[in-house]
């Protein structure tokens, strides 16, 4: 995502619930943003009250994760990313990622 500095944040209760539900920590999920092939699209289906984004990429443990988040680039030097959900990517998502769709 264009060489900017990322600042990550999340709700700890939500982060703990995400580990219980999907077995993926937000600490691991944040590493997908280092993937130069990161696939990102607007999450229009879940963007009723806020603009959500959906990315698929490799995490540092070698797994391909799907991550939902909000982001703000109000500061031109820093992109703030608020993680909402993270899980192992589904097979169809992995195929999209591999095909660069």
Positions of PLM-derived features:
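Ribonuclease/tRNase effector modules and their secretory precursors
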Residues: 1-101
